[in-house]
């Protein structure tokens, strides 16, 4: 267990994950980063992405996370995210509708807030990528 650390993933509505892991890979605006046990203290943000981690039993796991705040301290990592969903929790039809709606809003951006449409498009795209990658 010396090469593991505690990962907590929380959203406003629930605790999504709380267990020991070997490593976590996330994406920030500056690129991908990986966290291992005994990482230095850090506060960072992420962009919507497919977060990857290896649990203490060696199983590879993936989940969608929306924009997040990440805090690492004393071998504990807390990801506070607007949304976090494992593949089985993603409603594919809803994600498809959100993707099409955002795509339409980007095409007609003079009628919509382009930044919000881009964010919605990217979130839906990441959810669908995770859902379809595990088929």
From Swiss-Prot:
Q: Give the disulfide map.
A: none
Q: InterPro entries, alphabetically?
A: ATP_F1_dsu/esu_C_sf, ATP_synth_F1_dsu/esu, ATP_synth_F1_dsu/esu_N, ATP_synth_F1_esu_C, ATPsynth_dsu/esu_N
One Pfam family from the record:
ATP-synt_DE
Single GO MF descriptor: ATP binding
The subcellular location is:
Cell membrane
- State the UniProt keywords alphabetically: ATP synthesis, Cell membrane, CF(1), Hydrogen ion transport, Ion transport, Membrane, Transport
Name the domain of life this protein comes from: Bacteria
Gene Ontology cellular-component terms for this entry are:
plasma membrane; proton-transporting ATP synthase complex
**Membrane topology listed for this record:** Peripheral membrane protein
Q: Please tell me whether the keyword Cell membrane is annotated for this protein.
A: yes
Q: What PANTHER family does this protein map onto?
A: ATP SYNTHASE DELTA/EPSILON CHAIN (PTHR13822), ATP SYNTHASE EPSILON CHAIN, CHLOROPLASTIC (PTHR13822:SF10)
Protein family (similarity comment): Belongs to the ATPase epsilon chain family.
What is the purpose of this protein?
Produces ATP from ADP in the presence of a proton gradient across the membrane.
For this entry, the protein name equals ATP synthase epsilon chain
Q: Which organism is it from?
A: Clostridium beijerinckii (strain ATCC 51743 / NCIMB 8052) (Clostridium acetobutylicum)
- Which gene codes for it? atpC
């Amino acid at each position: 267990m010396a090469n593991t650390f505690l990962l907590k993933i929380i959203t406003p509505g629930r605790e999504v994950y709380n267990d020991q892991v070997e490593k976590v890979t996330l994406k920030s605006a500056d690129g991908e980063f990986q966290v291992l046990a005994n990482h230095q203290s850090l506060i960072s943000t992420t962009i919507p992405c497919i977060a990857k981690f290896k649990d203490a039993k060696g199983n590879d796991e993936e989940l969608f996370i929306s924009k997040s705040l990440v805090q690492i301290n004393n071998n504990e990592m807390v990801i506070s995210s607007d949304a976090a969903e494992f593949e089985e929790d993603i409603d594919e039809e809803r994600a498809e509708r959100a993707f099409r709606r955002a795509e339409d809003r980007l095409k007609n951006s003079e009628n919509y807030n382009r930044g919000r449409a881009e964010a919605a498009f990217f979130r839906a795209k990441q959810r669908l990528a995770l859902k379809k990658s595990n088929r």
